[in-house]
A protein has these predicted regions:
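N-terminal catalytic or cofactor-binding beta/alpha core of small enzyme domains
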Residues: 1-119
Length: 119
């Protein structure tokens, strides 16, 4: 079992640590190399909860397909229940990666976490 890893985004090598661990985790949970899909969860109107929709917008602007949740069409507490059947279907064909902000204690502020688990 892969345990969570926390990465301080202020570290100079944070991007390298994140990408190395993401690659490891994807190889572990997606050994057959299924295409990726992204569930970018959050509220576009709440600054502390907009990481998911913001990342979804950036991913779509870079031409990635199978991105669910953008600033224009957020995947949040109101829309997620309606979209769960779609995401369950997507999960059968794709390796689904969830991107979401989390509110934690002040010591966790600015940290990224990678965790294997269900949506």
């Amino acid at each position: 079992m892969y345990s969570s890893i926390w990465i301080n985004s202020a570290q100079p090598d944070a991007a390298d640590i994140f990408s190395r661990n993401l690659r490891y985790l994807l190889n572990r949970v997606n050994p057959r190399g299924k295409p990726l899909a992204f569930a970018c969860i959050g509220s576009a109107n709440v600054p502390g909860d907009s990481l998911g929709p913001l990342m979804g917008t950036i991913l779509t602007r870079h031409g990635l397909l199978n991105v669910y949740g953008t600033m224009e069409w957020p995947l949040n507490a109101l829309t997620l229940p309606h979209n769960m059947p779609l995401l369950k279907t997507v999960e059968k064909k794709y390796c689904l990666i969830a991107i979401d902000a989390a509110i934690g204690n002040p010591a966790q502020s600015g940290h990224l976490t990678l965790t294997e688990g269900s949506l």
